[in-house]
Every structure is written in structure tokens, then in C-alpha cells.
């Protein structure tokens, strides 16, 4: 986001041309760090289908995407993407908006049910009762992608502080967790490695395996924790 929020040094080596063809492009909300116009435009011919919260599809239509390829969802709505793949839109405690708009589109987390294998994407958001509600609604969660970066006490309602990340992790109790939202854009004042280190410590303290793969690497769902290792420096 030129002039406002820049990537951490070295975090922009993965570019649009590196993104492979996508069966489904899933967007959690329309903030610039999640919905980047140059990237979305560059991969348009490689995206078979877009799934996003209510209202976000208008951006894609304005940027030349076929409306027939766009599926908008609301909280607790499920969409079957394939015979053995169902996606459910779930609440998060966040907000939405771009330059001239605020909260005119929905924000969300999502649960993938892949033939009984449950993969949870929290989306952006602060701590709230929705985490336990997700667990109660969906049962066992095999893999969770849980946001853990760009936090600050001044906006703890919309991003998880490390202590709240641990609470959320305990609520959803996944078999394996992958922290995200931590090492791309400098939206807060912490050093870029701090969220990763805190997540690793917090996950270990509650005995939940944590995986921290490098961008672009593949994760085997049969053994997702195998992809994790400490690749960041102790002192950035």
C-alpha cells in the first residue's frame, strides 16, 4: 500500500506471476492487504472461481471478473465447491472498507470440510466468543490458519494480541495450527519476527503442534506439522 503501509524488507519477493492456476480464490474481506488490485488483475485468467463475503464480489466485477465465477457468502452459509469439498462462511470480529468506504461489505472466516477433514481459516479479527462457537458448531478441527500479527493494544478488538491468540487457539483446539498475517505488511510497530516467535511459544504451551512453512511451499494435509521449522532469525 504505497505511501501508507509497506511490506517488510524482503517480504515482496513472491509476486503475482508466481501464483499458480487457482481452482478457487478465497477472500476474507476487502482491506488492501487482502485484496490487492494489481495482483487480482494479474491472475484473472488463472482463477476459475472466486468465493468471498457479501459485497466483496462487486470489486471483482469492477475489475473484469465474470459474475458467473463469483460466489458471495454470508455468515453460516455453506457452499459446495466439489463433491467432497464444502466451504462454510463463519463470523470474525473485524471490519471492512477501502479508501472511500467503511463496513459496506462483509468480513469473515471460513471452514473447509474436505471429505470430513476440517480446515479453519480465521480471517482477520480480535478475540471473541465466535472462536468457541466455531468449535461447538464444527466439532474437531484438523488444521487451523489463525491470524497472529500486526496487533496493537490500541486495536486489540480487531487483531489478536499474543495472549488472545492463545485463548483463541485453546477455544478452537485444532490438531495443528499455522499462524498467519505476520510477516508481510508492517501495519503495527512490532518487529516482524515477534508474532511468529510468540505463536510458537503459545502453541507449545498448550501442546498444539504448530507449522510455519515458507511462502510457496506445500503442506501435506496428512502431516501438516512436518512443513514447519524456524526459518526466521532470532534477532531481525
Which sequence ranges carry the predicted segments?
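Short, surface-exposed connector motifs at secondary-structure boundaries
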Residues: 39-46, 113-119
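Conserved beta-strand hairpin/beta-sheet module of binuclear metal-dependent hydrolase folds
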Residues: 1-12, 103-123
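Cap/insert and terminal regions of metallo-dependent hydrolase folds
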Residues: 24, 49, 55-58, 118, ...
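Metallo-beta-lactamase
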Residues: 52-117, 198-216, 222-223
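Metal-dependent catalytic neighborhoods of phosphoester/phosphodiester hydrolases
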Residues: 37-44, 187-197, 223
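Pre-active-site segment of Zn-dependent metallo-hydrolases
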Residues: 1-30, 37-42, 52-55, 97, ...
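Short, basic/aromatic-enriched C-terminal tail that caps enzymatic domains
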Residues: 217-236
Amino acid at each position: 500500500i504505497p505511501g501508507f503501509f509497506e511490506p517488510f524488507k524482503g517480504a515482496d519477493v513472491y509476486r503475482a506471476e508466481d501464483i499458480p492456476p487457482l481452482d478457487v480464490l478465497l477472500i476474507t474481506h476487502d482491506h488492501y492487504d487482502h485484496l490487492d488490485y494489481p495482483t487480482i488483475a494479474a491472475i484473472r485468467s488463472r482463477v476459475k472461481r472466486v468465493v468471498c463475503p457479501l459485497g466483496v464480489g462487486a470489486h471483482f466485477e469492477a475489475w473484469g471478473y465474470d459474475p458467473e465465477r463469483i460466489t458471495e457468502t454470508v455468515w453460516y452459509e455453506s457452499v459446495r465447491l466439489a463433491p467432497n469439498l464444502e466451504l462454510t462462511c463463519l463470523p470474525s470480529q473485524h471490519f471492512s472498507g477501502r479508501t472511500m468506504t467503511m463496513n459496506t461489505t462483509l468480513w469473515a472466516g471460513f471452514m473447509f470440510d474436505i471429505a470430513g477433514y476440517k480446515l479453519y481459516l480465521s480471517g482477520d479479527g480480535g478475540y471473541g466468543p465466535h472462536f468457541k462457537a466455531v468449535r461447538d458448531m464444527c466439532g474437531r478441527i484438523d488444521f487451523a490458519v489463525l491470524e497472529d500479527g500486526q496487533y496493537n493494544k490500541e486495536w486489540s478488538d480487531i487483531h489478536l494480541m499474543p495472549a488472545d491468540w492463545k485463548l483463541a487457539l485453546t477455544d478452537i483446539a485444532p490438531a495443528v495450527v499455522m499462524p498467519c498475517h505476520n510477516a508481510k505488511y508492517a501495519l503495527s510497530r512490532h518487529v516482524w519476527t515477534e508474532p511468529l516467535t510468540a505463536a510458537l511459544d503459545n502453541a507449545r504451551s498448550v501442546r498444539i503442534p504448530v507449522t510455519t512453512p515458507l511462502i510457496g511451499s506445500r503442506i501435506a494435509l496428512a502431516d501438516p506439522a512436518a512443513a514447519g521449522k524456524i526459518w526466521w532469525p532470532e534477532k531481525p
